[in-house]
Amino acid sequence: MTSLRTRMRMVERLRDKGIVDETVLAAMAAVPRHIFVEEAMAHRAYEDTALPLGHSQTISQPYIVARMIELLRAGREQSLPGGLGKTLEIGAGCGYQAAVLAQLAPDVYAVERIEPLIERAKQNLRQMQQFNVRLKYADGQLGLPEAAPYHTIIVAAAANRVPPALLQQLAVGGRMVLPVGAGEQALHLIERTPQGFLETKLDAVRFVPLLSGVE
């Protein structure tokens, strides 16, 4: 169940669901999702579903990972390395989405507020020999100002409102995608222009909440 063939079947399902960016699909195919899930869940690693990680967190559904990255890359493939440039991820979890991003972006900064998860992420990324990801144990709502600004910000937990710190850390010309909402949630795409921010509400989604502090 962990073979490349199984992984490619997952990619075909993503294509069937509407993911058209072949570069994103190739990145999804390159990352062995089974090493990022609990051993007891390894047989379900390539299902298109979120899976529990412990600590009330989940590893995101593959379709949502691909969809968010596709939104961030659209129209920027020629202007930025990997269509993403320098990327900030909020909610690194076990490191799966960071590993996918790292197939495309030259530099990925990933923040996680739960210490046991970030230790697992470090181990998983080391196993993959993925050395262009910098992991930080910190409050994701505050972003990572020391490496700002970012061309791309991706958030893997739902905020009641867009965190101001993340807006400040987005470069002019940059894009951010994140789920917004307490009850009903939707993906929001935010683009920073010289004049300000453009915000577009997109797909209905369900994510764990974006919490403050660390644990």
Task: Please provide the spans of the model-predicted regions.
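Conserved nucleotide-cofactor-binding alpha/beta core module
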Residues: 72-198
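Class I SAM-dependent transferase core
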Residues: 1-88, 100, 104, 117-131, ...
